[in-house]
């Protein structure tokens, strides 16, 4: 009977230990690849350690009081002590000082995250059910980013494909958002249908995409942070909410400029091909044959 019970306990433990097939996870937020993300991380850790020390003090004092002043040791309640001005001043002043100490860096970080002025590149981000649209404002380049074919095939019921064999399962797309490193990029985030949320942890950005409303965010990625970074929609937006990942590919400025030129050339060629049939002259109808007299 005990072996059977241990088996039931082992199942959830193994589930927790096993690597997730559909997502990467961590116990803490990442430091990120921007100055703002590191500021957010620092604020988060400052708050965390303050809470830890408060918990250690409060629970430590409670446990000490319970053990030392327990009834079995002959302790009796003190009915005379009902008020202590000095103690009340201390336990009021300390929380106020803690809140002020947190408010200063929090306000500084909040102001920094909202300052999208002097951006060098503007990208319009639009959420759809269930994909993301990216438009590079002023460059004539736009793209739709959807779940890649391998992940889409593996997620289908009865596909027979083991998700563990798919690289970056449910976290890969056909067309990633390409951005340059060392450049201040401004995002204008909105949605076409329902509320979505554009969330990329390494940038410390999580902004709702709301139909008829534009939210603003910005980032400037470290010059040495060339690579690919992944996020997800963080707002329940319908049936396929879990299947519209966010992938950002960071390139050097030179590589990004070359990529933009390639995309512009491809867009121009596609537009020319689409306009060609409309520009061709209509065929002259054949003359009707003359009637025999």
Task: Give residue spans per PLM region.
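N-terminal secretory/membrane targeting signals
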Residues: 1-24
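Non-transmembrane, membrane-proximal soluble domains of secreted or membrane proteins
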Residues: 23-46, 66-293
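Alpha-helical transmembrane segments
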Residues: 44-69
